[in-house]
Amino acid sequence: MNTQILILAISAFLCVRADKICLGHHAVSNGTKVDTLTEKGIEVVNATETVEQKNIPKICSKGKQTIDLGQCGLLGTTIGPPQCDQFLEFSANLIIERREGDDICYPGKFDNEETLRQILRKSGGIKKENMGFTYTGVRTNGETSACRRSRSSFYAEMKWLLSNTDNGVFPQMTKSYKNTKKEPALIIWGIHHSGSTAEQTRLYGSGNKLITVWSSKYQQSFAPNPGPRPQMNGQSGRIDFYWLMLDPNDTVNFSFNGAFIAPDRASFLRGKSLGIQSDAQLDNNCEGECYHIGGTIISNLPFQNINSRAIGKCPRYVKQKSLMLATGMKNVPENSTHKQLTHHMRKKRGLFGAIAGFIENGWEGLIDGWYGYRHQNAQGEGTAADYKSTQSAVNQITGKLNRLIEKTNQQFELIDNEFNEIEKQIGNVINWTRDSIIEIWSYNAEFLVAVENQHTIDLTDSEMNKLYEKVRRQLRENAEEDGNGCFEIFHQCDNDCMASIRNNTYDHKKYRKEAIQNRIQIDAVKLSSGYKEIILWFSFGASCFLFLAIAMVLAFICIKNGNMRCTICI
């Protein structure tokens, strides 16, 4: 009897074997590992690098109005030492300073030098206007062998005012200049510190010297400090240069009685530019927007690990050499063990025994889309990509890199460490600030990429679930989920039927009657098969009970007829 039940169950199951459709996603044999907020080293199908490490060892100047200052220092363009004669006025949007460049000829320095350098780097070039100063009672042709052209000369944009005669009296003078332009004027003047008191008397006469400069926003007095200093360029004296930005319609006044280096022309800034200190060669055949001392960074990535002091439209500098941004779904490739198992199970169970747990295991053969279907029916087996869900995921992931760039993009300026003794403390603060910013942005970069990676993986999983739910809602009671991403269909589903499921045009009512009949038959088989062991044990128990009952009846009859005697001893 039990054997008959088992044979009937197997026969019924073979007769009603269901067609099947499964859902899966794309996988590759070798994915890329990324980090998320919750886990490090997650393997994804696609990822892109966000940290640029490739440097172009040239200054790419194509499309730029570039000026290469050569031996002229940028500050020198405002006062005019001989090496800067050709750059007294210029227009540029890319200014290149060289290591060999020098701002001065007569030894000295600029006050607040680095701030002025930053202003000029962004200036777009400079133009000049004569300030209209005239002098009587003094000489205006002071010159020095430190500033040689064909012979001794002086700064082209400055006047070295001297007494009419050696040791002669230098008169008290006042000069004024009003800025009538619509943009600020850069005004530069100098204070001459003679190599000795005797030299100062010879040049400007005896007595204390005082220079006072004032405008509506500025007032400062200067006294020269004569005395011996180490010789530079054959000179023991020094000239210190000072400057101010004079607003439109404002007036600057100079009151002096010697030791004054007077401005001859005011400088005006032309527009906007980038300035970079570099000895890299100019290349007019490549374009760039981000520069550093070693060349050009050409990149569309949000971060770079090349130089922390790059300027222009640059990726953010971070300490990490690599930060991978996920642009595809989580990847679990079919390894060799899995492929062997797949082959074995196909022989044993067909195509769909190989893709159990489809959400954890992708299909390496699904190359036309990120998501897709595999089916098995009387006509054979097939695989097809689902373009709608793929496109939905792609649309949301496309532009992730650009959005990351928007969050991090900024125009950078270069602040060098060329500070004088008074400014060294400021320089230390700037360096500390720069290091702190790098630390912050290195952390921010890692966090931003991890957030985006988390979102990408969650997004692609969500699209997979949406696709699965779409199929489940269509099939309804006409199919049963097997828990492995597949649906066993309780009716004959040919290729057109499978296509209607994929296209979301499946009509479950059309197949409902056939599906219900097959479901009842299959459920009955499953029920019989499921209770097989219970029936066997029940039959065994009933047989044992029947055997004991017969034995007891026979014993009773024998005792009654005297054929058997039972003696009980106490």
UniProtKB/Swiss-Prot annotation:
One of its GO terms (biological process) is fusion of virus membrane with host plasma membrane. Homotrimer of disulfide-linked HA1-HA2. The keyword Disulfide bond applies. It comes from Influenza A virus (strain A/Equine/New Market/1/1977 H7N7). The keyword Glycoprotein applies. GO terms for cellular component: host cell plasma membrane; membrane; viral envelope; virion membrane. The gene is HA. A lipid is attached at C566, C569 (S-palmitoyl cysteine). Palmitoylated. In natural infection, inactive HA is matured into HA1 and HA2 outside the cell by one or more trypsin-like, arginine-specific endoprotease secreted by the bronchial epithelial cells. One identified protease that may be involved in this process is secreted in lungs by club cells. Residues 19-533 are extracellular. Residues 1-18 form the signal peptide. It comes from the Viruses. HAMAP family: INFV_HEMA (MF_04072). It is a single-pass type I membrane protein. This is Hemagglutinin.
